[in-house]
Each structure stands twice: as C-alpha cells, then as structure tokens.
Amino acid sequence: MRAGRVWVDGRPATELGMRVDASTARIEVDGRRVNVRANHEYLLLNKPAGYVTTAADPQGRPTVMDLVGTRARVYPVGRLDADTQGLLLLTNDGELTHRLTHPRYQVPRTYLAEVRGPVSAEACKRLVDGVRLDDGPARAVSANVVRRGKTRTQVELVLTEGRKREVRRMLEAIGYPVTKLVRTRFGPVDLRGVKAGTTRRLAPHEVGELHRIVGL
C-alpha cells in the first residue's frame, strides 16, 4: 500500500489496516478494479501445532475451525498438517480457493523450517534442483539458510505447490529431519502481527492481490 499501488474511491490508500465498506467502495490495485464481494469472508489464521486442517475430525482431535471466530461457513485454503504451524487462509470464495491451490497458478508459499544439524549451500541447491519423493519429483523455488545454531539450522523455503507434508519430506530426503515448521507467507499475504491461535480478516487490498495473482 505504501508504494501507492492500492487506490480506494479514487484516492491512494496508504494506511495499513484501513477499513472500507466492500459493498460500496471502488478498490483498484495497479489501476485494475478489484471486486470484493460483501458476502465473502477472507480470514488469516496463525495455526498452532496440534490442530488438524479440517472442519470435523472423526478422531476427536482439535481442528482449525475451533479457532475461527465467525458464523460464516469458511473453509481452509489447502492444508497444513497437524504438526505444522503458521499461516492458513480460510474463505467461502470457492473459485479463489480453487485457483490458489491449483498447481497451474504457481502461487508461492514461504516456510521456515528448523532442522537438526548444519545445512550446507550444496544442500540448499539440491532442494532447488529437485528431489525425488514417493509421489514424484519436488523442487523449491528458493532455499536459504537464515539462522545457524549449535545443533539446529533454520532454512527458508519457497514452494509453488502444496503436496502432503512436502516440505518435511523434501528435507528428510536429503538427510535433515524437521523439528519445527512454520508457514510464514501465502502469495502476497504474510503472518506478521497475528498471534498463534488467533485470526484476522484480510484487508481489501490483500484480497485484491490474491485475486490478481490468479487472474480473477
């Protein structure tokens, strides 16, 4: 917003978190009008570990819906496994959900993985070049060490697909068991400012950016 790309009712929107009436406001991103339907909900959840990404669990485990404070029938955009933390989008916008999760649209997801042991530049290169998993080859758009500790290393990875436990399996395939995994970003939306176990509504410009990157 601060770059002047978002306009509301003919004026630049520069205040993060500004509120507008989606049913009447004219919202533009990069000069292109964005239609945000008033009857659609768009939420961001900072998912804690221990919650499954489903509406109801036959085993009685806690689900992400237990954390969503809305009466609207929203659904997760893709999945995070129970042990994975971080950014999970929820919406009742079916077409947007379909496009955000379809490999054709190459929507980037950013993860911060903590693994045991030191991680070399060569190991990061292997993740980008691609590794073979049981369900086919997988590769990261980028993989970089962001923090080194005495016994553990943090690696940031960007992927454009969301196969089951893909990040964990990729790292395990090259010898690095994952001890903690957090998704920090989905497309243009990031996790900053949202405490674990809480949600916030997406701002109109964030909804607009999500629509834009998948051609809606």
Predicted regions: what they are:
Residues 1-216:
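Basic, flexible Lys/Arg- and Gly-enriched helix-loop patches that mediate nucleic-acid binding at interfaces
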